[in-house]
Amino acid sequence: MPNVLEEVPRPGRVAIVRLRSLGDCVLSTPALALLKRARADLRVAVVAEARFHALFEHNPDVDDILRPDPRVLRRWRPDLCLNLHGGTRSAFLTLVSGARWRAGFGHFRYQFAYNVHIPRAQEILGAERTVHTAEHLASAIFYLGAPVQEIPRARLGATGQPPPARPYAVLHAVATAPEKTWRADGFLEVARHIEESGLEAVFIGAAGDDLRPFSRHRIVQGAPLGQVKTLLAGASLFVGNDSGPAHMAAAFGLPSVVIFGPSDPAIWAPWRARSEVVKVPGGMAEVTVAQVVNALVRLRVSA
């Protein structure tokens, strides 16, 4: 493997392009930690949409957060630009970044945008198996020259808050697609079980989500990501569909029960967090309340 990181000047500047997807942004943070471990002198910028900037704030592995504007990126003057997204816009940003080294995975489109072509994660890790998204993203850092090692948990920085007056669990009962969304009455039954254990059930969702079925419980809706980070950082438990907030919860080491539809848990399960995955062959419609409650019991979380 080439050792690009050894060739980058000291001190050097590395821009990481990570557009779109809450979960992917969270799961890119182990790669950022590995990069800083390998070269503590590097100044690292993350290029991301404004709505995701809060995910990278207060992270000691991130020095700058840039909006995805070619002029902004060129003015930042990266020595190395690594694309962890792979779409058209991210390829263009990488191409015009002005970086001497422009790196992207070999399966990305627009290979002309890159002069460092990263092979499959399985080849880098020496493991012919399905790899988790965190492993896939981290493998790019290994290929660039960081020592291959255990990949850490995702990392989100949050401002310190006093302990809550009452311990609580966060429930995320919505998702981006119907086939990834468990039924509302199931979540209500699970919330009842959680409250019987002594935890308050707090439901979260985006501004456009329909949270009316959960109105008897505390609801945090449309909150900025920074506030959601703080809420998760202070929680005792997370229960939710396979979605971005589940990865945020795992980044805080929150014991989690995650209900899966069509996605593969080998790729998308909570990374390095105490968790239980509930997935059945028939999809979300076949998941029972008993299965989710039994997963909660196995986690042994209570007030």
Label each region the model flagged:
Residues M1-A303:
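Catalytic machinery of carbohydrate-active enzymes
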